[in-house]
Amino acid sequence: MIIVISPAKSQNFEPIKTAYQFTQPIFKQQIIKLINILKHYEVEEIEKLMKISPKLAEEVFAKHNSFNPNKYDNSNAKAAIFTFNGDVYKGLEADTLDNKTIEYAQNHLLMLSGLYGLVRPLDLIQAYRLEMGTNIKIDGKILHKYWQDKITTQLNEYFSQQQNKILINLASNEYSQAIDKKSLAVKWLDIDFKENKAGAYKTIGIHAKKARGLMTRYILENRIENVSDIKKFNVAGYQFNPDFSDENLLCFTR
């Protein structure tokens, strides 16, 4: 069983004290190609491309121009699971997971990324900003199409080493489209979270993101390897709701 989640635009590069064996990014050649493209963008072009403020565009410009794709160590990079800092990761709270759970996560959790493709928890990453939906082309393909065959091939290779061949999709649509479901030789299971508002159940972005992190933590801490145990998730008021679920989707409501 492998979980996939989205990355986060917010990143924390404060040093941490750990004794983990960090790993290098999976797709180094592709990262070099992408970062070289990004380095050609001036501040004003970044602002338009990423639809961000001038100040933020300057920060992104600086990040990409200081990026060294040939060097990943503690001086310029940090393990991904401790770096991403958005709502999903606030639910995950990786810095409070014990060592054995982090080591388990290394083989059961993957983060999708516009720049890195697939990221394992202990892969070292440098500061960047490149959402999967960004309107750039590489080798004549839009970004998620560029990554699709590479990510899917790598996932199939990882699943060849897994006993339970189920992909738990806790990523957003923007990122999960970088996986070719038809070419993935495993079961695909989506998970959704809904809130009861005035008698109607709705998926609310900020709550769903944090819940994805909570679910990721639940699966990792409990070493869950089957769907029936996922249904037992009962955190932050969420419970499995069969009325909104089917064989390819588990929905949890509160």
Curated annotation (Swiss-Prot):
**Cellular component GO terms, alphabetical:** cytosol
In terms of InterPro entries, this protein maps to:
YaaA (IPR005583)
Q: Name one GO biological process term.
A: response to hydroperoxide
User: HAMAP family recorded for this chain?
Assistant: UPF0246 (MF_00652)
Family (UniProt): Belongs to the UPF0246 family.
- Name-wise, this protein is UPF0246 protein FTW_0267
**Organism of this sequence:** Francisella tularensis subsp. tularensis (strain WY96-3418)
Recall the taxonomic lineage recorded for the source organism: Bacteria, Pseudomonadati, Pseudomonadota, Gammaproteobacteria, Thiotrichales
